[in-house]
């Protein structure tokens, strides 16, 4: 994207690429990622990395869970990326490649597995990179079916120096991601329960109307 691209330009391009109403529950996701990608696109020392791709796709998938209509989800990420000069399909492919590779590694082997992902000197760090590291730790083979998230976040922080990530920011970014994910999951569950309750009420009313019609 050119240096003159403003956030207003990015928003305009986004709405042209995705001319659909976004439910309030998901509007924050769209707004925050749009602004985040816009700012990164203008950061001269920022370069996309495989870990960034994993983190971006993880954040998007986490906070778009339950989105309806489901067929709009791919287009939403496409528009968020394209409006800022990025390609969502490239990120998706890179993310899948990294996750597939992580699944063949043990959790203890991930430090050496990720050694080649060190951020270059002077390169701009993004929270999405740290989230990408966490996701790969989650995908690695472990002894437990459900890995301890706090332990994995600790491992990510310990690895941050080797990856040339700011350790304190990594800890803060991962903690915030965890708390926001929990809140989003609870909100989605509440919405789904409300929809299910409304559906049951509607079905009861229809059944009662049918009984009255027959009597």
Swiss-Prot record:
Q: Which keywords appear in this protein's UniProt record, sorted alphabetically? A: Coiled coil
Report the coiled-coil segments. 188-209
Recorded hits in InterPro entries, A to Z, give: Thf1
Instruction: Please list the GO biological process terms of this entry.
Output: photosystem II assembly
GO CC terms:
plasma membrane-derived thylakoid photosystem II
Q: Which domain of life is it from?
A: Bacteria
The UniProt function text for this chain reads: May be involved in photosynthetic membrane biogenesis.
Stated family = Belongs to the THF1 family.
Would you tell me the protein name for this molecule?
Answer: Protein Thf1
């Amino acid at each position: 994207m050119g240096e003159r691209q403003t956030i207003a330009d990015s928003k305009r391009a986004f709405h042209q690429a995705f001319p659909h109403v976004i439910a309030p529950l998901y509007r924050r996701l769209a707004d925050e990622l749009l602004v985040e990608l816009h700012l990164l696109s203008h950061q001269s020392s920022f370069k996309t990395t495989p870990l960034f791709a994993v983190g971006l796709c993880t954040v998007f998938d986490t906070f778009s869970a339950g989105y309806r209509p489901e067929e709009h989800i791919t287009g939403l990420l496409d528009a968020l990326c394209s409006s800022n000069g990025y390609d969502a399909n490239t990120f998706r492919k890179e993310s899948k490649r990294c996750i597939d590779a992580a699944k063949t590694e043990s959790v203890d082997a991930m430090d050496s597995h990720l050694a080649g992902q060190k951020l270059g000197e002077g390169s701009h760090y993004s929270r999405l990179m740290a989230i990408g590291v966490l996701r790969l730790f989650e995908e690695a083979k472990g002894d437990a079916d459900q890995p301890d998230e706090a332990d994995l976040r600790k491992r990510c922080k310990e690895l941050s120096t080797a990856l040339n990530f700011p350790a304190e920011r990594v800890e803060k970014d991962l903690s915030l991601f965890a708390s926001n994910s929990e809140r989003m999951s609870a909100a989605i569950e509440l919405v789904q329960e409300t929809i299910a309750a409304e559906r049951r009420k509607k079905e009861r009313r229809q059944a009662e109307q049918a009984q009255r019609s027959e009597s």
